Design a protein with these regions (language model features):
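Short flexible coil/turn linkers enriched for glycine and charged/polar residues
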Residues: 145-149, 159-160, 256, 266, ...
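Short, hinge-like loop/turn segments at secondary-structure boundaries
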Residues: 98-101, 121-123, 216, 250-251, ...
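Hydrophobic, well-ordered secondary-structure elements that form the walls
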Residues: 262, 303, 323, 331, ...
Length: 439
């Protein structure tokens, strides 16, 4: 039994870097601490406990993690500092040496943080607790809301793909998942708490079922039957795991939205092979075509990495032309970052930082062009929009089913409500459409 009396009336701050999955897991950590008697520190209040959930997808992510730790140590003198997440799993010794860090928890340990916090006293030096990647077995459930309107439901963790540029399998372990029954129950609980929208999160969610003998399609169908949840979004799914069966089901689903996020990474078959991706451009293009065939107005986001080792100028031009021809909505562009221990380091051709920047800027410009064209096609239409809680100012925003961001005049009564909105022209920044509520 853990003695939780030491946690009573203590305060905590939380800092999360990286993906939606990390935000979901931080929320679960916060829930564990709340149940032990810890409250979230108010703005400007010195905290007794600092939780940092880290990312390690790039070298820049590592740097941001270190900066965040230093900043929190300075802002909250005397606080017990706990660092977890991918950077903590990959470099526990380095993190433990950072001045002010008390406890470092790996992927397997973060769900049990109370037992590692002990008496909640500062340590002489950081203590690291991790498990070898090959021995990471547990699946820690997480369904978070926090200060976000939508819920994030963790359905899967880990990855078995071992792409040549990526350290995530080493940080997260092998693919594993919750049971459909447990995930449906979490969705029902979210609905009971007033949730209208759930985003399915994971590392490789299309690989769902490895540890339970179920399939992602089975999960989609089961969640679609949960009463009270009006919208589901699939956060990201590998193209080779996005079956025509899933696409067709979403097109006629009650609650799964016409919104997909699909990692391409490169539009060059040669580079995809160097990356050890499990598809080629022909398969990727066929998935986009299938989506648009049955859902012409679907929003499709695509991940692209520029400047990977082996990406010659010719291969990039080939990739650019392929992406230019795809009927997609938005590009999420990342510059390749060298990661220790990856197979990509054995590839000879190295792209200069200047070339990476130029390629990134070209793709970002293309993305902007595609997104604005997609938004413009919907001007003048009336569409249901799920409104999100207003922030400071005269405007609040929400999203259509196909993920168009819409701004309307602020009205707190509209928070978490689905209302019909007439879509007008772009806002001044060009980041949303101005809307008028019609009901």
């Amino acid at each position: 039994m853990i003695d939780t009396t030491v946690f009573q009336d203590k305060t905590a701050v939380y800092y999360t870097l990286g993906c939606k999955l990390n935000f979901s897991e931080t929320s679960t950590i916060g829930k564990i601490l709340r149940e032990a008697g810890v409250r979230t520190a108010r703005k400007g209040e010195k905290a007794d406990l600092c939780i940092v959930n880290t990312c390690s997808v790039t070298e820049m992510a590592d740097k941001k993690c270190r900066q965040a730790i230093h900043r929190l140590v300075k802002q909250h003198p005397g606080a017990v500092v706990v660092v977890t997440g991918c950077y903590a799993q990959l470099k526990p010794g380095d993190v433990a040496k950072i001045e002010g860090v008390d406890v470092v928890l790996g992927a397997e340990q973060k769900k049990d943080l109370l037992q590692y916090l002990g008496d909640l006293h500062k340590h002489e030096g950081g203590e690291a607790y991790t498990t070898a990647t090959k021995d990471i077995r547990s699946f820690a459930p997480s369904c978070s809301r926090g200060d976000r309107t939508r819920f994030f439901l963790k359905v899967q963790d880990g990855c078995d793909y071992f792409c040549s540029y990526c350290t995530i399998p080493f940080a997260r372990g092998r693919s594993r998942n919750g049971t459909i029954a447990s995930l449906v129950e979490q969705a029902r609980q979210a609905a009971a708490e007033g949730g209208k929208e759930i985003v399915l999160t994971g590392v490789n969610i299309g690989d769902f079922g490895k540890s339970t003998g179920e399939t992602f399609f089975d999960l989609v169908k089961a969640l679609d039957r949960v009463e009270g949840i009006e919208r589901y979004r699939i956060s990201s799914i590998e193209p080779n795991l996005l079956t025509d069966e899933i696409i067709e089901y979403v097109s006629r689903s009650r609650s799964f939205m016409p919104h997909f996020h699909i990692p391409l990474q490169s539009g060059s078959d040669e580079v995809l092979q160097l990356m050890r991706r499990r598809y080629g451009t022909e398969l990727f293009a066929s998935k986009i075509a299938k989506i648009k065939e049955v859902m012409p107005d679907a929003f499709i986001g695509v991940d692209v990495i520029v400047g990977t080792r082996g990406e010659t100028a010719g291969y990039f031009e080939k990739a650019y032309e392929f992406i230019h021809g795809l009927d997609v909505t938005q590009l999420h562009v990342f510059s390749y970052s060298e990661r220790p221990g990856t197979q990509a380091l054995k590839i000879d051709h190295v792209v200069t930082p200047e070339e990476k920047h130029q390629r990134s800027q070209r793709l970002l410009a293309l993305s902007d062009e595609k997104t604005k064209a997609f938004y413009a096609r919907h001007i003048g239409q009336t569409m249901p929009v799920l409104m999100e809680k207003p922030k400071a100012g005269a405007l609040m925003h929400g999203f259509t089913a196909n993920y168009i961001r819409v701004e309307v005049e602020s009205d707190a009564a509209l928070d978490n409500k689905v209302v019909n909105v007439l879509l007008g022209d772009f806002n001044e920044e060009g980041t949303a459409l101005k809307g008028t509520i019609t009901q």
